[in-house]
Amino acid sequence: MLYSMNLQKLTGRHTSFWLLLAMVCGTLPAAGNVPAEVDPDYEDSVVMIMAVHQEYDYTTPWKKGSMGRGLGSGFVIEGGRILTNAHNVANQRYIEVKKQNFARRYPARVEFVGHDCDLAVLSVADPSFFMGTKAVEFGGIPTINSTVQTCGFPMGGRQISITEGVVSRLETSVYSHSQAARHLV
């Protein structure tokens, strides 16, 4: 199931926020020349995920695959957890999370992962990480022609990116991460 968030409280405008688009940070056309902003109450709730991963070599399992690292986006949700994409933490060896404009990184661990829907839930043992954050609220699926906003750290960017656009189509498709099921995208 795809979740979205109503950002009426975040921006003071009636907009819907499509969480999956935000985490993947697909590009949407800019809505005018006004820069998009997120309510300061939620600014620290969008976090950077840094993962060290190691691919498995299924043909020679006694050999370790090469190590790599990646960056992604996540969002603080209720229960002191972070929602992110499964592909951000797949084959992970070590995960850290960081809030925007903060230097400190916090170790995180995978609590749940759903590769078929490309979603994962992370936990952070240190409760100080969640100070100043507010759990993002889930809303319904946006309607055609509604304004949506994406925010996150796309393509390994180290600065948060916020983009607004309009929903032009809703459809189901084979999901890109697992190719195993059809989901609303």
Where are these regions (language model features)?
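Active-site region of chymotrypsin-like
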Residues: 45-51, 56, 60-63, 125-135, ...
